[in-house]
């Protein structure tokens, strides 16, 4: 049959492989096993979800040992068609193979193969069963012969073969030898290729069925010969691959020169097996090995074909573009035409929905997904008629003509007998049937073997050659016989109608009962799920409340309410226990309903197999119920996932804020350590790593300054007035900067030396040297030119100061701000040292944090200070801690009376802006001015006017130098603080707030050095005095005066301050820093050089007796204060690197008497700070130097105030944490009296 010349010139078309998935119903053992769950959920006709995260049954474990340790995979797969557990054999056939039958008859090749693991339902799909009905093979042959019978214009020859591949050997299943397919007596067949490179199997038998019944008998016989053995996973496991090949030859009766040829291959593959799961040994193990080998080769071919098709689509070239490993197995060689030939292929992937077959199902879905990308070229097979075939047909025609003549003679004899005798009706009826169907009368006669389908041609040709006279005789005969047949049929119909009625009534009753059961199961399950959802929500609320109560119970602030907390905790525990009991009962009922639905999937088709219409109705109802339950589960899951996502988002946000806050403290410590030459290489490396981690934490941390510069919001706020004059040094008397737009960028190195400089920027076209991008800044030396981000400085009206959110800084400048920045500073760095600006976080709108990351070891002197003024009221919003790198050109006044001169130095240093906090409110308001030499930290408290009202603005005047030996003074930071009513809100430790009567402190400019030393001596001598009026109820733990910066509270928390009336005073360490500063201020023109201890070398013949006495006095006071050597070891301190003191504009002298008690812990702490080599030494040392020890003041009856230092207040906008405490560091009693001096 294959020796035909192929003259096919038809066009070829590309067609993708059709991939479908069928999910089998679960077995009884799988349903009863509580450890196994359903892991496949059908969404619609084209999509399924593998291993879903079901809420009611929990996430299933996708590992081999069924351990609930891994999260569900939840992979979504889309195929050409997905059949759920309710799908019938007819439904699968109609949506897969039915269209292929007409496709094959028209002269094309097609193949259908079932792929899957052992026990997944492949044989059930292809062959069928007694209870479930026939499979695809049987239904396909029925459809084929029905189409052939309907087509009267063509002649057809149908042939079939049935073989198996067992242990890599090919066996014929239709042979008549005894033993069957598994017997060794069967002949092993060989594969070969013909001249057209088509696969041919030698000695394979071909049968020529003439009806579907003959095909059923042949299939039944072949399946009995097929090798099957029971295994651990399947009692009727197929141990071989079965291939049913059907060829159809078509010849047009009008044009007999054209013959089309079509081939349909139906393949039932054996299932892949896992030896550890099947527990096979001996022959079963050998069979499983061969099966897995051939399936692996098939999988490799599918994978290679998929990659080849992808490369062809993308026009890419692979290493082996044309190599497909067909020869790895005999199965792949047989399926070569089906995979890559001119063939339309349909793959039916059979999977199990149970979790016991997790890996097998997952692998099957992956191979099916790959097979979707395979494309084949489809060509119609049309052959020219050969001479041998024509002669064969001529012989058939001759035989048919002879038969026609014989039949005509018989017909004549029969008609003559009918005229003679009218009583032989039975004989006439037989003659009628023989004359009507020609070849049926000769059905028992043998037919010559190369032409088995002759009966089909004979039936068709007989109809064409019949005479008209015969037709008339037959019509008369039909009228006589119809009366007899009708009478007999009426009697049979009456009996059958009564039986059918009874059957229909019982069937309808069963249908109604099953429909009610499905509906009741759906309603009951939905009610239980809704109740379960409500109880889960209630349980979460109670658990959250329980956690908050446990935190309150651990806090010392709620000792009085412990009884109520314990009572409420017990109530919540009992409620949670009841909810858990109710949930367990609900889960049991849900499991019972789920088991009933799973059983229904397999029992439904068995009960109503004889009534397909009723079966379809019930299947639709069951699918609708399943879809409703899935929709409810998905809705609940979406709600649950959304709540979890919001919770995680808030946690991530708080963690980011905490990390940014902690890194801000670390950057401050780095600044102080590098300024004092205490930073080690390990610390610098760790600091760089932490900076990179913070920078790469999230893209949301990085601010797009292009957007910020174009969207700078001007916020009118009467409560905040912050002025920073750091970037532009204007030596002016009147400097009016009117910036009506926020997109004005100024040059960092801009020095305006004009007396009147009016800058009116009313448009957006101000182009400067600065770009609004996060560009790293490289500083190779101290004189490196860096273009940094500028600020938009405005000059609002005196009544309504405005707050500008500009780029990375919040700038608000009050009216008539006349200032002159004259500072002394120097920066020294190694020649290879560099610094980069790293953007680490977005604390609030328009704020950015930048730090200097040194790559090599950097040594520098003390930082340069900005001039700032702050005005805060009771409605002040919280703001965040920022550390901003600024490039400044400072004017250094390095002049004497004889040699006046100035220097300009480019300096890059981080300027720390301290965090906002809500301040306690009072009925009266005071104004205080604070200054700091190192960071923006309070140093002094200045008295206010008698009106106790805040000034609308402050004036920062240049320092008036009354002493020739005084050097350039650092600019002063003034803070106008309007104090509202007292409320228990924490105050940062760097802010000093008097409550009712402000404490007048001496101004450095109004006192000479002797008066300063006298007052400081009095403070140090009285520090051992005890405070008898100390209120112990307001005290806190004082064993830890110094706190590591990373142990401080994150910005989103706030601690309540007890008692409500608070005041912050300076610590002993701050006082010591003041003594050291005074020593530097008094002698910085004499080229001082600091030694390792507190002894200073003032040079030769440059120190007067008076200064020497003062120096000794300072040293003794310092050592008395701390009882330890000074921790700051500065080497080679130059005159331009000294710390300048802050000068107040109001000469006020105050006599102060202070009694201070310093615990011994302070001394030990400083020892550990100085001599320890721990990695946190720098941070602790920074805390000691830069932070002012806070104190709490409580009014006393003796008109004295108790100072209680505590740990730095927590930053940010969070709720109060009851578990945190404010720890005191020392107790100080201050008696003050004011004396105003002109």
From Swiss-Prot:
One of its GO terms (cellular component) is kinesin complex. Keywords: ATP-binding, Cell cycle, Cell division, Coiled coil, Cytoplasm, Cytoskeleton, Microtubule, Mitosis, Motor protein, Nucleotide-binding, Transport. Residues 437-464, 1191-1203, 1229-1238 have a biased composition (Polar residues). Belongs to the TRAFAC class myosin-kinesin ATPase superfamily. Kinesin family. It is found in: Cytoplasm, Cytoskeleton. The keyword Ubl conjugation does not apply. GO terms for molecular function: ATP binding; ATP hydrolysis activity; microtubule binding; microtubule motor activity; plus-end-directed microtubule motor activity. The keyword Nucleotide-binding applies. Its main location: cytoplasm. Residues 468-497 have a biased composition (Acidic residues). Residues 417-503, 726-802, 891-971, 1134-1156, 1191-1238 are annotated as: Disordered. GO terms for biological process: cell division; cytoplasmic microtubule organization; microtubule depolymerization; microtubule-based movement; mitotic sister chromatid segregation. It comes from Dictyostelium discoideum (Social amoeba). This is Kinesin-related protein 10. Residues 417-436, 726-795, 918-934, 961-971, 1215-1228 have a biased composition (Low complexity). Microtubule-associated force-producing protein that plays a role in organelle transport. Its motor activity is directed toward the microtubule's plus end. Cooperates with kif8 and dynein to organize interphase microtubules. ATP binds at residues 116-123.
């Amino acid at each position: 049959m294959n020796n035909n010349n192929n003259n096919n010139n038809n066009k070829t078309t590309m067609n993708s492989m059709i991939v479908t998935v069928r999910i089998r119903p679960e077995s009884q053992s799988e349903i009863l096993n509580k450890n196994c769950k359903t892991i496949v959920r059908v969404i619609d006709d084209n999509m399924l979800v593998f291993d879903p995260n079901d809420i009611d049954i929990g996430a299933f474990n996708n590992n081999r040992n069924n351990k609930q340790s891994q999260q569900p995979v939840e992979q979504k797969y889309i195929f050409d068609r997905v059949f759920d557990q309710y799908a019938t054999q007819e439904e699968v056939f109609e949506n897969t193979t039915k269209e292929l039958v007409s496709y094959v008859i028209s002269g094309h090749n097609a193949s259908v193969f079932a792929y899957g693991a052992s026990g997944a339902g492949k044989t059930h799909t292809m062959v069928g069963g007694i209870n479930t009905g026939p499979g695809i093979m049987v239904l396909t042959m029925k459809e084929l012969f029905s189409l052939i019978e309907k087509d009267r214009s063509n002649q057809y020859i149908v042939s079939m073969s049935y073989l198996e591949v067992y242990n890599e050997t090919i066996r014929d299943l239709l042979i008549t030898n005894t033993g069957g397919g598994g017997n060794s007596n069967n002949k092993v067949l060989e594969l070969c290729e013909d001249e057209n490179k088509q696969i041919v199997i030698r000695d394979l038998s071909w049968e020529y069925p003439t009806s579907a019944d003959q095909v059923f008998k042949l299939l039944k016989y072949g399946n009995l010969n097929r090798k099957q053995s029971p295994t651990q996973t399947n009692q009727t496991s197929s141990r071989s691959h079965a291939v049913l090949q059907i060829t159809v030859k078509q010849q047009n009766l009008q044009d007999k020169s054209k013959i089309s040829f079509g081939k349909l291959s139906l393949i039932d593959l054996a299932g892949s097996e896992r030896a550890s799961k099947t527990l096979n040994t001996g022959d079963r193990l050998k069979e499983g090995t061969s099966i897995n080998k051939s399936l692996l080769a098939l999988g490799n071919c599918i994978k290679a074909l998929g990659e080849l098709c992808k490369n062809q689509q993308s026009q890419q070239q692979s290493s082996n573009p044309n190599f497909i490993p067909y020869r790895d197995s005999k199965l792949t060689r047989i399926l070569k035409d089906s995979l890559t030939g001119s063939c339309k292929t349909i793959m039916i992937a059979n999977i199990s929905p149970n979790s016991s077959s997790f890996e097998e199902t997952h692998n099957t879905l992956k191979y099916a997904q790959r097979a979707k990308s395979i494309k084949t070229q489809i060509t119609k097979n049309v052959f020219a008629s050969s001479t041998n075939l024509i002669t064969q047909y001529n012989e058939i025609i001759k035989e048919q003509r002879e038969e026609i003549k014989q039949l005509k003679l018989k017909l004549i004899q029969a008609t003559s007998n009918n005229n003679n005798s009218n009583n032989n009706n039975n004989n006439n009826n037989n003659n009628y049937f023989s004359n009507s169907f020609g070849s049926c009368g000769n059905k028992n006669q043998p037919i010559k073997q190369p032409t088995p389908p002759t009966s089909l041609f004979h039936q068709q040709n007989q109809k064409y050659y019949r005479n008209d006279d015969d037709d008339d005789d037959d019509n008369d005969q039909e009228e006589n016989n119809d009366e007899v047949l009708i009478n007999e049929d009426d009697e049979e119909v009456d009996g059958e109608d009564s039986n059918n009625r009874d059957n229909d009534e019982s069937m309808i009753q069963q249908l109604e009962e099953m429909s009610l059961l499905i509906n009741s199961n759906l309603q009951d399950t939905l009610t239980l799920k809704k109740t379960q959802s409500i109880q889960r929500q209630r349980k979460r609320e109670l658990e959250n409340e329980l956690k908050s109560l446990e935190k309150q119970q651990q806090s010392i602030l709620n000792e009085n309410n412990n009884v109520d907390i314990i009572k409420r905790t017990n109530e919540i525990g009992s409620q949670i226990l009841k909810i858990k009991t109710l949930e367990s009962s609900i889960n049991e009922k849900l499991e019972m309903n789920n088991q009933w639905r799973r059983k229904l999937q397999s029992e439904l088709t068995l009960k109503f197999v004889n009534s397909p219409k009723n079966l379809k109705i019930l299947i639709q109802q069951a699918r609708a119920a399943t879809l409703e339950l899935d929709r409810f589960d998905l809705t609940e899951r979406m709600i649950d996932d959304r709540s979890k996502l919001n919770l995680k988002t808030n946690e991530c946000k708080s963690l980011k804020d905490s990390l940014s806050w902690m890194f801000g403290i670390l950057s401050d410590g780095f600044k102080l350590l590098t300024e004092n030459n205490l930073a080690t290489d390990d610390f610098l490396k760790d600091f760089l790593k932490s900076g990179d981690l913070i920078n790469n934490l999230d893209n949301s941390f990085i601010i797009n300054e292009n957007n910020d510069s174009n969207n700078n919001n001007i916020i009118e706020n009467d409560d905040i007035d912050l002025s920073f004059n750091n970037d532009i040094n204007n030596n002016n008397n009147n400097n009016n900067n009117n910036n009506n737009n926020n997109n004005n960028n100024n040059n960092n190195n801009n020095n305006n030396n004009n007396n009147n400089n009016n800058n009116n920027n009313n448009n957006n076209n101000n182009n400067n040297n600065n770009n609004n991008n996060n560009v790293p800044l490289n500083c190779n030396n101290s004189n490196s030119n860096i273009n940094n981000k500028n600020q938009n400085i405005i000059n609002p009206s005196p009544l309504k100061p405005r707050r500008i959110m500009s780029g990375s800084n919040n700038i608000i400048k009050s009216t008539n701000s006349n200032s002159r920045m004259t500072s002394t500073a120097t920066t020294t760095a190694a020649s290879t040292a560099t610094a980069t600006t790293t953007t680490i976080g977005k604390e609030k709108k328009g704020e950015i944090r930048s730090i200097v990351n040194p790559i090599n070891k950097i040594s520098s002197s003390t930082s340069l200070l900005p001039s700032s003024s702050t005005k805060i009221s009771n409605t002040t919003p919280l703001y965040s801690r920022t550390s901003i790198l600024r490039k400044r050109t400072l004017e250094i006044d390095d002049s004497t009376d004889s040699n006046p001169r100035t220097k300009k130095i480019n300096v890059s240093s981080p300027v720390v802006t301290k965090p906002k906090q809500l301040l306690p409110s009072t009925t009266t308001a005071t104004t205080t001015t604070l200054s700091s030499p190192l960071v923006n930290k309070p140093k002094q408290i200045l008295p206010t006017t008698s009106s106790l009202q805040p000034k609308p603005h402050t004036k920062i005047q240049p320092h008036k130098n009354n002493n020739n030996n005084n050097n350039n003074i650092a600019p002063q930071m003034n803070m106008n603080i309007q104090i509202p009513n007292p409320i228990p809100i924490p105050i940062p430790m760097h802010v000093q707030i008097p409550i009712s009567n402000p404490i007048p402190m001496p101004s450095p400019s109004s006192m000479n050095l002797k008066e300063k030393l006298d007052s400081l001596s009095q403070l140090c001598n009285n520090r051992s005095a005890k405070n008898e009026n100390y209120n112990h109820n307001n005290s806190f733990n004082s064993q830890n005066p110094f706190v590591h910066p990373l142990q401080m509270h994150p910005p989103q928390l706030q601690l309540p301050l007890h008692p409500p009336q608070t005041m912050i005073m300076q610590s002993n360490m701050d006082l010591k820093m003041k003594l050291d500063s005074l020593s530097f201020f008094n002698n910085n023109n004499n080229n001082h050089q600091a030694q390792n201890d507190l002894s200073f070398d003032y040079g030769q013949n440059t120190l007067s007796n008076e200064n020497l006495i003062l120096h000794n006095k300072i040293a003794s006071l310092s050592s008395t204060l701390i009882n330890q050597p000074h921790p700051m070891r500065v080497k080679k301190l130059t005159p331009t690197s000294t710390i300048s003191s802050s000068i107040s504009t109001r000469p006020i002298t105050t006599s102060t008497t202070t009694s201070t008690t310093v615990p011994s812990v302070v001394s030990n702490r400083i020892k550990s700070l100085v001599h320890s080599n721990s990695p946190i030494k720098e941070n602790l040392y920074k805390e000691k130097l830069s932070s002012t020890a806070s104190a709490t003041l409580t009014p006393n009856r003796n008109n004295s105030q108790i100072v209680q230092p505590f740990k730095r207040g927590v930053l940010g906008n969070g709720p109060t944490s009851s578990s945190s405490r404010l720890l005191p560091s020392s107790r100080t009693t201050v008696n003050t009296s004011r004396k105003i001096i002109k």
